Amino acid sequence: MVWTSRICFRKYGNFVDNVRLYVRGGTGGMGLPRLGGHGGDGGDVWVVAKKDTRLKQIKDKHPDKRFIAGVGSNSSIQALRGAKGEDVEVFAPTGISVTSDHGRMLGELNREGDKLLVAKGGRGGSPQSGFLPNKGQTRNIRLDLKLIADFGLVGFPNAGKSSLLTALSHAKPKIANYPFTTIKPEIGKVMYDDHKQVSVADLPGLIEGAHVNKGMGHKFLKHVERTKQLMFVVDVCGFQLASKTPFRSAFETVLLLSKELELYKEELLSKPAILVINKMDLPEAQSHFQELEAQLENQGESIHLFSEDVIPKSLMHFTHIVPVSAMTGHGLPLLKSLIRQSLEEQDTIDTEAQRSQKILELRREIPSSSIPSWGLPQPT
């Protein structure tokens, strides 16, 4: 038996998934030459992960989006060592990445309490600097929220992702028979009778050219990175975005989705993935599905029928291929079972990999003569 529930992701109004900030460490304090006194260091700027915080709160509370730490105290007769300037903390949600304006990754905040130094304060005046202080570090940074979910639904507009999410959970994304119905991420939770929960993220539909940010592709592709597994959702009868765009068969759709992920970030194709073939209630769906099955089984031969701009360098390997109808419920019990099975298999593999890595590290630290060799993988 399986039942469903809903998780509400958007607690506030407009969904904000990124924010750009100006941060500056405090200037150090002046030294005192005649007594050899040291000025205090300037304060630092930190980004801190805090529960129940949203990026929208930062924009609302700090419209100028400027965070400047305190200046270090000057050295004086009363205090030869000046006090450090006051630190500034920027509270942000968990599950964000922090990058510089130049695109350099500064770090990630994945758990509550995680802290990241983003602007260091300047050193106070000292004999080494002629008792003159240094200015604090100045930079613009970007905070990007990436959804953290077990599965991310990947598909072109109108593939039925929103309908599938509704069928799998009680999330209620907007559903209509036209492309781009979903314009904001939506998360649903599937709950099983033993209280196991699996989160599924419905991401806005991709279009061809998403990897170069067409249709705000980067805005949506980045969320895929923080899902454990992917779930491709494909219309069994094919897809056409508009009358002036080419019609794509179901197999072409699979290739194009893989291509877009590959061009954005190739390692995304190494994620475990389930292929869901939706709309099996439509006329001639069975014959289309049989054709797709044959093409997937003989991908090496089938891809030569398509142009190179459609074909990814690496073909996506799907752990399961499941025909369903989100409208009638056909195939959904099997899909729910496979969703859980796939996650449990990944957890087992990850646990074993971590165990092997720890053992290898232990062997490097301890002489081989002092520990038994049975059951231990040999270091490479």
UniProtKB/Swiss-Prot annotation:
InterPro entries: G_OBG, GTP-bd, GTP-bd_Obg/CgtA, GTP1_OBG_dom, GTP1_OBG_dom_sf, OBG_GTPase, P-loop_NTPase. GO terms for biological process: ribosome biogenesis. Keywords: GTP-binding, Nucleotide-binding, Nucleus, Ribosome biogenesis. Residues 13-148 form the Obg domain. One of its GO terms (molecular function) is magnesium ion binding. GTP binds at residues 155-162, 202-206, 278-281. One of its GO terms (cellular component) is mitochondrion. It comes from the Eukaryota. May be involved in the ribosome maturation process. This is GTP-binding protein 10. It comes from Danio rerio.
